[in-house]
From Swiss-Prot:
Residues 21-175 form the MARVEL domain. It comes from Caenorhabditis elegans. This is Synaptogyrin homolog 1. GO terms for biological process: regulation of exocytosis; synaptic vesicle transport. It is a multi-pass membrane protein. GO terms for cellular component: cytoplasmic vesicle; neuromuscular junction; synaptic vesicle; synaptic vesicle membrane. Coiled coil: none annotated. It is found in: Membrane. Residues 206-247 are annotated as: Disordered. InterPro entries: Marvel, Synaptogyrin. The keyword Transmembrane helix applies. Expressed in a wide variety of neurons and is expressed weakly in the non-neuronal distal tip cells. A punctate pattern was observed in the ventral and dorsal nerve cords and the nerve ring. Weak expression is seen in neuronal cell bodies and commissures. The gene is sng-1.
Length: 247
């Protein structure tokens, strides 16, 4: 019973429904993050550099900092890899029967999404400020094309929104999973029943329900000189007229 809808996934071993899977908000956000990561990687690697007419090597359009362009391409590449891994992990979630393993998977999803959200937020402002600070030499004869660099900035912003949305839904799934797994189950409810009810009395009055527990109640004695024994009445039974274990 604990595996049913544990941490946003259904019963372990359930059939995979791709139509339902690709309609999930987390999957949609990760697909968007994958696409924007590809755009960032391609835009910066192909159009984030400029070769001045008097230089041998090209310079990065983001403030002439080669490390910034390398950082942008690396972030785009790892964002694509991370989105693919998390999509596959979400697709395999229904096959995981262990609730603690599901908890660790959702927690890893939350941590990775939050890290990429912070990285893209920092990267967006960094790329924007450094592209604005790029200055062209007056004697440079080669025209500068900044369209790809600007697409890189836009894709960094959109990646921030996509990973932020994925992190939000991962956090919601983690919180809902914690609440579901910490709710008292039937055994805990049964353990809270007072001992005078457990000893000698069954729920429902017969074998229906949980069944007869202990020995039958003592019969009243009518021998001469002996006071009649009174049978203690059990408290009201919330499981009366219930079948099985009430699940």
């Amino acid at each position: 019973m604990e595996n049913v809808r544990a941490y946003g996934a259904g019963l372990a071993g359930a059939n995979f429904d791709k139509n339902t899977f690709f309609k999930k908000p987390t999957v949609l956000f990760r697909c968007a993050a994958l696409l924007f990561g590809l755009i960032l990687w391609y835009s910066v690697s192909k159009g984030g550099w400029h070769k001045p007419s008097d230089a041998i090597h090209p310079v990065c359009l983001y403030g002439r900092s080669s490390s910034t362009c390398s950082f942008a391409t690396a972030v785009g590449f790892f964002a694509v890899c991370g989105a693919i891994v998390l999509i596959v992990l979400d697709a395999k979630m229904d096959q995981i029967s262990s609730v603690p393993t599901r908890r660790r998977a959702v927690l890893a999803d939350l941590v990775v999404s939050a890290i990429f959200t912070a990285i893209f937020l920092i990267g967006f402002f960094t790329f924007w400020s450094k592209l604005s600070a790029f200055e062209v030499d007056e004697d440079d004869e080669n025209p500068i094309k900044t369209n790809n660099a600007k697409f890189g900035i836009l894709s960094a912003l959109l990646s921030f929104l996509a990973w932020g949305g994925a992190a939000f839904f991962a956090w919601r799934r983690y919180e809902e999973g914690n609440q579901a797994t910490h709710e008292p189950n039937y055994d805990e409810h049964f353990g809270q029943v007072s001992t005078d009810v457990q000893d000698g009395y069954g729920y429902g009055g017969d074998s229906t329900g949980i069944g007869h527990v202990g020995a039958p109640p003592p019969q009243s004695s009518y021998q001469s000189g002996a006071a009649p024994q009174t049978m203690q009445q059990p408290p009201s039974n919330p499981y009366t007229q219930s079948e099985g274990y009430g699940y």
